[in-house]
Amino acid sequence: MITGKQQFIYVTFQEEGIHRYPAAAHDPKLKTGEWNDVSFLGVEHRHIFHFRVELEVMHDDRDVEFIQFKRELQNLYRNNMMTLDHKSCEMISDELARYINEKYPEREIRIQVAEDGENGSYTVYRPSVALDEWIEIEEGA
């Protein structure tokens, strides 16, 4: 017996970006000189960032048309409204979620951002928490 449902659409796309993790160049936890050394992340390096964005929809008849949604998100980067440079996957996700939340309010948003389709972040943004408040809580923790 089904007692309720929550529906999502999802889109995937890729964008090229250059970024760096400045702390990696000098933080002893990152610049270890051992097998786990990641100090190379402190210099600019290129990635193809892979996105998977899920958006809650309110009905099953193209509440949000996913091809249009995908193009809308791609254009944010292609028209330089958003940039990937020098941001972590989590930062990229938060910035994208702010835009989506403003355009499509009161919907759950799920975003995956991966470097080269290999490693990345996955974040769920729930409409019951104001996005800016949630991000401030995380940054202040």
Regions found by a protein language model. Name each.
Residues 1-141:
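Charge-rich, low-complexity N-terminal segments
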